[in-house]
Amino acid sequence: MLIIPAVDMKNKKCVQLIQGNPDKKHVELDNPPEIAKKWVEQGAEMLHLVDLDGAINGKRVNDEFIEEIIKNSGVPVQIGGGIRSVSDALYFIEKGAEKVILGTVAIQNPKIVREISSIVGKEKVTVALDAKDGKVLIKGWTEKTDYSPVQIGKILENMGAGSILFTNVDSEGLLEGINVLPTKELVDNLNIPIIASGGVTTVEDLLKFKEIGVYAVVVGSALYKDMINLKDAILASK
């Protein structure tokens, strides 16, 4: 199981938000490329980059840092946040991103997944599913749909998604530990890799995800607040 450190960017700073709220930050650090370099030096085999400006208001202001990290990190990079069109996705793939992460656009228009995966290959297309109380959220967690993660996950899989990045919003950013059952439902019902995210605070949390068969776990706040040591986490996940 891969451990993937998160490098979330807002206004050209590396941040970690509480429950996705842009006004509530655990962490705010300068120089995201240096942060990314630190995680790679500690053994990260992949990086998870999010452009929060792109995600929140549709304006990508962090491309320069994103491109620098892709170019210099020496490990595969997956990038999400504000990717709302085929051209947005192709832009980052052409810059060297290993995977692009689609959010709301893929849930509202699943055909875009087929279009992108037919050009770049399904292994390069991840769709982010965020859920609360068993229902998928869209538009930065501001709207709740009537559909479960498994219902939408199956549609996306059929459309050519190569993997699903699943965030249990009930846990995200609270540093209170995890409930793996919603993630397990996806693992059990889909045939593509599931990347888990949200609420990890201990190596024990990571082992719970490993036990249910997830492909990878994205870890954010717990790394930045020194609750988890990345080297220990990687060792435990092997």
UniProtKB/Swiss-Prot annotation:
GO terms for biological process: L-histidine biosynthetic process; L-tryptophan biosynthetic process. It catalyses: 1-(5-phospho-beta-D-ribosyl)-5-[(5-phospho-beta-D-ribosylamino)methylideneamino]imidazole-4-carboxamide = 5-[(5-phospho-1-deoxy-D-ribulos-1-ylimino)methylamino]-1-(5-phospho-beta-D-ribosyl)imidazole-4-carboxamide. Keywords: Amino-acid biosynthesis, Cytoplasm, Histidine biosynthesis, Isomerase. It is found in: Cytoplasm. Belongs to the HisA/HisF family. InterPro entries: Aldolase_TIM, His_biosynth, HisA_bact_arch, Isoase_HisA-like, Isoase_HisA-like_bact, RibuloseP-bd_barrel. Pathway: Amino-acid biosynthesis; L-histidine biosynthesis; L-histidine from 5-phospho-alpha-D-ribose 1-diphosphate: step 4/9. It comes from the Archaea. GO terms for cellular component: cytoplasm. NCBIfam families: 1-(5-phosphoribosyl)-5-[(5-phosphoribosylamino)methylideneamino]imidazole-4-carboxamide isomerase, PRK13585.1. This is 1-(5-phosphoribosyl)-5-[(5-phosphoribosylamino)methylideneamino] imidazole-4-carboxamide isomerase. Its EC number is 5.3.1.16. One of its GO terms (molecular function) is 1-(5-phosphoribosyl)-5-[(5-phosphoribosylamino)methylideneamino]imidazole-4-carboxamide isomerase activity. PANTHER family: 1-(5-PHOSPHORIBOSYL)-5-[(5-PHOSPHORIBOSYLAMINO)METHYLIDENEAMINO] IMIDAZOLE-4-CARBOXAMIDE ISOMERASE (PTHR43090:SF7). The active site is at D8 (proton acceptor), D130 (proton donor).
